[in-house]
Amino acid sequence: MSLKSEHRVNTSALQKIAADMSNLIDNLDTRELHFEGEEVEFDTSPGDPKAQEKYIPFSSIYNTQGFKEPNIQTYLSGCPIKAQVLEVERFTSTTRVPSINLYTIELTHGEFTWQVKRKFKHFQEFHRELLKYKAFIRIPIPTKRHTFRRQNVKEEPREMPSLPRSSENTIQEEQFFGRRKQLEDYLTKILKMPMYRNYHATTEFLDVSQLSFIHDLGPKGLEGMIMKRSGGHRIPGLNCCGQGRACYRWSKRWLIVKDSFLLYMKPDSGAIAFVLLVDKEFRIKVGRKETETKYGLRIDNLSRTLILKCNSYRHARWWGGAIEEFIQKHGSDFLKDHRFGSYAAVHENMLAKWYVNAKGYFEDIANAMEEAAEEIFITDWWLSPEIFLKRPVVEGNRWRLDCILKRKAQQGVRIFIMLYKEVELALGINSEYSKRTLMRLHPNIKVMRHPDHVSSSVYLWAHHEKLVIIDQSVAFVGGIDLAYGRWDDNEHRLTDVGSVKRVTSGLSMGSLAAATMESMESLSLKDNHRSHKNEPILKSVDDVDPKLKGVGKPRKFSKFSLYRQLHRRHLHNSDSVSSIDSASNTGSIRSVQTGVGELHGETRFWHGKDYCNFVFKDWVQLDKPFADFIDRYSTPRIPWHDIGSVLHGKAARDVARHFIQRWNFTKIMKPKYRSLSYPFLLPKSQSTAHELRYQVPGAVPAKVQLLRSAADWSAGIKHHEESIHSAYINVIENSKHYIYIENQFFISCADDKVVFNKVGDAIAQRILKAHREGQRYRVYIVIPRLPGFEGDISTGGGNALQAIMHFNYRTMCRGENSILGQLKPELGNQWINYISFCGLRTHAELEGNLVTELIYVHSKLLIADDNTVIIGSANINDRSMLGKRDSEMAVIVQDTETVPSIMDGKEYQAGCFAQGLRLQCFRLVLGYLSDPSEDLQDPVSDKFFKEIWVSTAARNATIYDKVFRCLPNDEVHNLMQLRDFISKPILAKDDPIRAEEELRKIRGFLVQFPFYFLSEENLLPSVGTKEAIVPMEVWT
C-alpha cells in the first residue's frame, strides 16, 4: 500500500470516529445523567507519596506543559476544592434583551481563595464540554495521550451531576437562593470527580492553571484566556521591530495576575511567553481611545505597553477593575514612589551582614550555594569559573565555583548567570570563555551575555553589578566579582610562592596538598576537553606567547609612565611569602595571622591566573586557568581590598527582582535567547519572604532598602533610575558627625560640563556647614593611590592612567570646583581639621629583597554617624552614579539595634551594623586588628583624628618614601623632577638592614594621599593619542 493510500485510509477512519462521536453526543439526554455513583474525594491513593505533598514546588514553573496534556499537576495533592455561590447580579432586561444573571462563585483550595463570575450560559457550555469529554473517553483511539486518559478514568464512575434545565428568564428573584444552591451542588460534585476535575475545560471554567497554587508565587489572582496584541516592548537601539502600531498580530494566551507581576502563557505548549512586573508606572486603561481596539484593555509599566482584547466593553471594564483591585490589595508597595526614587521599598527588621575583603564573603557564598534548593542567580562584571571560594584548598575541588555550580545543577537547582559582554578590543576578561565553560557543565545552567554592542548601540557602558542570589531569599550585594584577583583577607599578602597546608599534630599533609593540586589541574583539563601534558603549569612572564589576542606582553607605558618607573625600580625583584612559617628560609616582616591555623608546605592561596598584578600585566590565556602568567618569584601581586554584604527576606526578593527584570529584558532583546531553553524568570511573592530555609550566620536586623543605577539600555525601563546617587547625597547632607568613604574612584564635583554627579559638592557643603556652626565634623576618604584600570578601562597606557589621575585630583584638590577649592576660600588651611585623603600600601620580603606595593582599594562604601551604611558596586563617578551609564546595585542599611558608644566625647547609641563595620575597617587599615590597646570608639575626637588617623597615615607614608621612594610622591611636581627622583638611590637596596628597621615602625596599611604629584603637568590625554579620541565620559 502506498503512503498516499494509507493516509487516505487513516483520514477516513478518523472521520468515521468523529461522526460516530457526534451522533452519540446528539442522542445523550442530560436528564438521565443524574449523580448516582460513589463520590471520590481525592485523586491519589493513601499509599501514593504524592498524597503527602500539600504544595506544588516553586521549581515546577520550569516544567509547565500544554493545557490539554493529561498528566499535568494543577491542584494541590490530597486537597479538596470547595465551591460556594456568593451572590447573583441581575442586569435589567428590556422587551428585546432578556435578563442576565451573573453568579459570583468563591472557591477555596488549601490556602488559596479566589472568585470567578459566570453566567448560566457558561455553566451550560461547560456542561456540554464535559459531556463531549465523557463520550470521547469511551472511544478507544490508539494514541498515547488518549490511552493514558482512559486508563486513569477506568475505575471511576461515569455518572455526572445534572444541571438545572429551566431557563434563566423564568427565574424570579425569590428563587435565586434555590438556583444558587443547585449550581453550588453541581460544582461541588464535579470537583469531587478527578475524571472531570482534571479536564482542561474544568480548569478554564475555574480560572486555574499550573501556576495558580504555587505557594511562593503568593495569593491566587485573576486568570483567564485572552487575546493579546504583539509589540509594545521598549527596546532601545536599532531593534525597532514590533514598535509600529500597524505591524502587529493577535494571539490567544492565558493571562495570570499575581501580587507583583502578571504573565501570559501559550495554551498549546504551556510556555511562559512574557512577564510584566508591577512598578510605579503600572497603569490600566480601558476603551478604544486608549487601546485603538474595540473592547480593548491596556496595561502599562516601565518596560511595555500590553494591549488585550476582551469579549465586550463590560468584560474589559471588569478585567481592568479586578486586576487593579488585586494589585492594590496585595502589591501596593510596588506602585509607590519610594525614597531616593528607588524601585524598592524600605523594609524594617531585615537580616543583614557586612564583609571586609573576600575571604568571608566567598565562604558564605559557597555555604549558601550548598543550601540552594531551587534557584541560583549570579551577575558579575567578570566571572572566573575556576576560582576557589574556600581557601586554603584542603578539600580538592569541592569549593571551586564551577564544581559547586555543577553539583547543584545535578541536584536539580536551576542556575541563571548574566555576564557583561565586553568590547573585546578594550577588555580582556573573555566572557565568552566563561559562558562556554559554564554552559557545558549541565543543562540546568543558563548563561546570558549583554549588551550586543551593534544592535543596542551600547559601546561605552557596562553591567557593573556583582550579585549572588540564592532561592530569592538570600542575596549577596557588594563590589566583589567572583573573579581572579579578588580573594583576599586581612593580611593583604604581596606574594604566594607556595604557602598553605594545615598541619595537625604528628601528621604531615604534604601528600594531601600535592594530590589536591594534581586533582584540581586534571579536573580543569578534563572539564575543558583539552590536553596540556607538555605545558608547564608555572610560566614566567616571558613564556607567554606574545601573539595571543588580548595583550600578550607586559604593558608598555610612555617614556615617563608612572608605573614603568615604579616597576623598573622595585617590582621586578619583589615578591614575598607572608603566610609561611617562621622556620622557613624566607620570611615576611609582617606577622602571620591567616585565620586558618598554622600553615606549612607548598599549597597556594592564589592558583594560576588568580595570582595577578593587573598594572604590571593584563590577564592573558584565560582558557588556561591554572597556568601562571606572572612570575610570582619576581613580581608581587596587588592586594585587593573590598567590601560586601548579604541580605535576607524581602530585601533579597528586591535584589532578585532586579536580576529577573534584567534577565527577562535580555531574553526579549536578543533573538538567540528567545527559545524555551532560556525561560522567563518569575519573582517570588513578598508574602512568603519571611520563610527562610537558610540564614547566613552573624546577620543582624536593620532597616534596609535596595538602590540601583538602571536605564533603558540596561534594564529596559522607560525612565532611568539614579537612586544610589540620591542616597549618597542625602546621607552626606544629613550626617551629623562624620562620614567614612572607601571607593575605587573619586571623580565628582559637578561643573555641569564634564562631571555631573554632586557627591563631592555635598561633602564640601557639609564641611562648610559644620565650620559655620562651630561643629566638630570629620570626613575620611580612602581610595587607591594610583588608578588600577581594573574596572572600566584596560588599555594599559600611561595616558589613560594619567587621565584618571587628572579627574581624581580635580575632585580632591585641583581647581576651583574641587573640594579643597570650595573649602579654602572660607577655611584657609583649617580644612585639614575636617577631611583626610588616604590610600593603602604594604610591604614584604622575599629572597632577601624588600618589596612594596599599593593595596588596591576596590570598595564602594559609605558609613555615616555609626548608624547608616551604603554598600554596593557603584563607584564615585558619573559612570556609576548617573543611572544612564553603567548599571549598578547597592544597599542602604540603617541600624535599628544599638550599642552604647562614644561620639564627639559624649555618650552615643551606635548601630550594631554600622559601628561594627567601621571599627573593622579602622582596625584593619590602622593595624589594630590584634591589638585592642587603642580605643577607636570615637571617630570624631581630636585625639583619634589627629593623633591616630592623620599621624599614622603621615608616618607610614614618610617611612615608605624613605625606604622605597614610592610613586606617586609629593616631591615630584613635573616630569623633570620625576627623572631626578627616580635616579636617586633607594634605601631598601643600598642598606636593607636599616630599611628593615625603619619598616618595623610601620603600623597598618594607611598612607597619606600625595596632593602635589605632577601638579604642574596637564594629565589629560594629548592630542593625537588614541586616549584623546575616546569620549570624555569614558573617564568620568
Swiss-Prot record:
<dbReference type="Pfam" id="PF00787">
    <property type="entry name" value="PX"/>
</dbReference>
<dbReference type="GO" id="GO:0004630">
    <property type="term" value="F:phospholipase D activity"/>
</dbReference>
<feature type="domain" description="PH">
    <location>
        <begin position="219"/>
        <end position="328"/>
    </location>
</feature>
<dbReference type="InterPro" id="IPR011993">
    <property type="entry name" value="PH-like_dom_sf"/>
</dbReference>
<dbReference type="GO" id="GO:0000139">
    <property type="term" value="C:Golgi membrane"/>
</dbReference>
<dbReference type="GO" id="GO:0031902">
    <property type="term" value="C:late endosome membrane"/>
</dbReference>
<comment type="similarity">
    <text>Belongs to the phospholipase D family.</text>
</comment>
<keyword id="KW-0967">Endosome</keyword>
<keyword id="KW-0378">Hydrolase</keyword>
<feature type="lipid moiety-binding region" description="S-palmitoyl cysteine">
    <location>
        <position position="240"/>
    </location>
</feature>
<feature type="lipid moiety-binding region" description="S-palmitoyl cysteine">
    <location>
        <position position="241"/>
    </location>
</feature>
<keyword id="KW-0677">Repeat</keyword>
<dbReference type="InterPro" id="IPR001683">
    <property type="entry name" value="PX_dom"/>
</dbReference>
<dbReference type="InterPro" id="IPR001849">
    <property type="entry name" value="PH_domain"/>
</dbReference>
<dbReference type="InterPro" id="IPR015679">
    <property type="entry name" value="PLipase_D_fam"/>
</dbReference>
<keyword id="KW-0963">Cytoplasm</keyword>
<feature type="modified residue" description="Phosphoserine">
    <location>
        <position position="561"/>
    </location>
</feature>
<dbReference type="GO" id="GO:0005789">
    <property type="term" value="C:endoplasmic reticulum membrane"/>
</dbReference>
<dbReference type="InterPro" id="IPR016555">
    <property type="entry name" value="PLipase_D_euk"/>
</dbReference>
<dbReference type="GO" id="GO:0035091">
    <property type="term" value="F:phosphatidylinositol binding"/>
</dbReference>
<dbReference type="Pfam" id="PF00614">
    <property type="entry name" value="PLDc"/>
</dbReference>
<keyword id="KW-0564">Palmitate</keyword>
<feature type="modified residue" description="Phosphoserine">
    <location>
        <position position="591"/>
    </location>
</feature>
<dbReference type="GO" id="GO:0009395">
    <property type="term" value="P:phospholipid catabolic process"/>
</dbReference>
<dbReference type="GO" id="GO:0048471">
    <property type="term" value="C:perinuclear region of cytoplasm"/>
</dbReference>
<protein>
    <recommendedName>
        <fullName>Phospholipase D1</fullName>
        <ecNumber>3.1.4.4</ecNumber>
    </recommendedName>
</protein>
<keyword id="KW-0333">Golgi apparatus</keyword>
<keyword id="KW-0472">Membrane</keyword>
<keyword id="KW-0442">Lipid degradation</keyword>
<dbReference type="GO" id="GO:0032534">
    <property type="term" value="P:regulation of microvillus assembly"/>
</dbReference>
<comment type="subunit">
    <text>Interacts with PIP5K1B.</text>
</comment>
<dbReference type="GO" id="GO:0035556">
    <property type="term" value="P:intracellular signal transduction"/>
</dbReference>
<keyword id="KW-0597">Phosphoprotein</keyword>
<dbReference type="InterPro" id="IPR036871">
    <property type="entry name" value="PX_dom_sf"/>
</dbReference>
<dbReference type="GO" id="GO:0060627">
    <property type="term" value="P:regulation of vesicle-mediated transport"/>
</dbReference>
<dbReference type="Pfam" id="PF13091">
    <property type="entry name" value="PLDc_2"/>
</dbReference>
<feature type="domain" description="PLD phosphodiesterase 2">
    <location>
        <begin position="853"/>
        <end position="880"/>
    </location>
</feature>
<keyword id="KW-0256">Endoplasmic reticulum</keyword>
<keyword id="KW-0443">Lipid metabolism</keyword>
<dbReference type="InterPro" id="IPR001736">
    <property type="entry name" value="PLipase_D/transphosphatidylase"/>
</dbReference>
<dbReference type="GO" id="GO:0006654">
    <property type="term" value="P:phosphatidic acid biosynthetic process"/>
</dbReference>
<feature type="region of interest" description="Catalytic">
    <location>
        <begin position="463"/>
        <end position="890"/>
    </location>
</feature>
